[in-house]
Amino acid sequence: MKQVVIASRESPLAMWQAEHIRARLQALYPGLEVSILGITTQGDRILDKTLNKIGGKGLFVKELELAMQEGQADLAVHSIKDVPMDLPEGFALAAICEREDPRDAFVSSRYASLSELPAGAVVGTASLRRESQIRARYPHLLVKPLRGNLQTRLRKLDEGQYDAIILAASGLKRMGLAERIRMELSTADSLPAVGQGALGIEIRADRTDLMALLAPLNHPATYACVTAERAMGRALGASCQIPVGGYAEQHEHMLVMRGFVATPDGTTLLHAEATAPAEYADALGRTIAKKLLDQGADDVIDAVKAAG
């Protein structure tokens, strides 16, 4: 194989991620020509509505999959948290790279933490998962939708439209903006999204040549953790329309995982935790989902969908 084309969203963060994978591939295979095909996805174009109102995170990946299907690109680089739990038939995740910081970050010009915000302060987030956890812990705060790429969200904060915003720490760090983080929220305070902080490389399932080429980029511990998280999400029928979080960590050969399902207003928050050997990652995720369903998660999910 002499050349590879990477499909990527055109936001600065997405292009950084694609450039990162390009650099890693060229370091591994010095003779390989790697180019990037930038694509503006539907999710990037529709910015006046929240994702749960316009079809969810699949809007960020469909055009990239089409480019692979039509032979314009060989692979696509995604933030795993933006990838639907079920890939379309004919596609596969060839590699999941080592995870960056999975935590949520508190960003504000005036305040050092969520606990410092006064009653009625406006917090911006694009995520129902973040909203539900903030409203459960800080019911006196006002949570408002926040769309746009990373730079747009920071600009809206700086213009005074919000008192604080919550973003993925990994994105800020990858873009060299770690100094904007006032506080990283612990995973106990804000359980991350499924796959948060990890990059995934998607290919057509019939491209066995690419599967071998990309194998060195796969990080086994991250792959196991994300496999467990996505198995939980799949079993719950999770999407960005439902406040769901899942986070697994590997300690030696064991995975420790926590998951939650909530209502957006934070009045109902169901938690579950379990442990399993890393080779049973998929089963661990399904165990977490079952524990949540046994607590009534299906009723919560149905109620959120009906209200949606």
From Swiss-Prot:
Cited SUPFAM superfamilies: Periplasmic binding protein-like II, Porphobilinogen deaminase (hydroxymethylbilane synthase), C-terminal domain
Function: Tetrapolymerization of the monopyrrole PBG into the hydroxymethylbilane pre-uroporphyrinogen in several discrete steps.
Protein name: Porphobilinogen deaminase
Domain of life the protein comes from: Bacteria
Subunit structure: Monomer.
PANTHER family in the record: PORPHOBILINOGEN DEAMINASE (PTHR11557:SF0)
Catalytic activity annotation: 4 porphobilinogen + H2O = hydroxymethylbilane + 4 NH4(+)
GO molecular function: hydroxymethylbilane synthase activity
Pathway assigned in UniProt: Porphyrin-containing compound metabolism; protoporphyrin-IX biosynthesis; coproporphyrinogen-III from 5-aminolevulinate: step 2/4
InterPro entries (UniProt xref): HemC, Porphobilin_deaminase_cofac_BS, Porphobilin_deaminase_N, Porphobilinogen_deaminase_C, Porphobilinogen_deaminase_C_sf
HAMAP family (alphabetical): Porphobil_deam (MF_00260)
The protein's required cofactors: dipyrromethane
UniProt keywords, alphabetically: Porphyrin biosynthesis, Transferase
Cofactor annotation comment: Binds 1 dipyrromethane group covalently.
Extra information: The porphobilinogen subunits are added to the dipyrromethane group.
Source organism of this protein record: Laribacter hongkongensis (strain HLHK9)
GO terms of biological process kind: protoporphyrinogen IX biosynthetic process
Catalytic EC class: transferase
Cellular component terms per the entry's GO annotation: cytoplasm
Family statement: Belongs to the HMBS family.
Statement: the UniProt record of this protein carries the keyword Transferase: yes
Gene3D superfamilies: Periplasmic binding protein-like II (3.40.190.10), Porphobilinogen deaminase, C-terminal domain (3.30.160.40)
